[in-house]
Amino acid sequence: MGGSGGRAGLTPGFAEDAAAGAGRAFTARTAPGIVARPMEAVLLIGLQASGKSTFCREQFFDTHVRLHPRLLGTRERERLLLDACLAARVPFVVDDTNVTRLERAYYIGPARSAGFRVVRYFFRSRLHEALEHNRRRRASERVSEDEIRATSARIELPKLSEGFEELHFVVSHHDDSFRVEPWRD
């Protein structure tokens, strides 16, 4: 039980707060402490070492579930988490390169079918900048230069017609700050 004075597993005051709300119906808009979030799928697009993960942490850490292949280990786990986000109507961000239309379609189709708004952030992907940023990373975070070059060769610029509701262009600076601009075709 510990010295909390409450039941095991509950934080002090939780039972009292729950009892105070007993019998009252809450919605996402009226429940205390709950903020309604739009059903939103965010795709980050760009070379490795272009700033996507840093931007993701700064912009979406508190609001979206992060889908990242290195974090999850396998595409099967990623698909399970994606399906869970869609079923639970939870906003998510795909923190991966997503450089081809086919790679993006894997997320866009299911998200739109589930009623999600799809937003895209394309990171300026200059090969020499990504290689330099990669060299400055901690050894455990570095990607092989060959992998970055191969990704650069596959980039297909995204288009609104792919199913995005919003398109943004992101410039990453050496101090890990970002400038977000409207997309211009």
Functional labels for PLM-detected ranges:
Residues 38-41, 129-185:
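Conserved GTP-binding G-domain of TRAFAC-class P-loop NTPases and closely related GTPase folds
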Residues 116-130:
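Conserved phosphate-donor/acceptor-positioning beta-strand/loop module used by diverse small-molecule
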Residues 43-57:
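Glycine-rich phosphate-binding P-loop
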Residues 64-66, 118-120, 166-169:
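Conserved beta-strand scaffold positions in the cores of enzyme catalytic domains, especially
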Residues 26-34:
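Pre-Walker A adenine-sensing motif
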Residues 53-103:
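Conserved substrate/cofactor phosphate-moiety recognition/catalytic segment
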Residues 36-41, 57-58, 69, 88, ...:
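Catalytic phosphate/metal-binding cores of nucleic-acid and nucleotide-processing enzymes, i.e., regions
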Residues 1-25:
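Compositionally biased, low-complexity flexible segments
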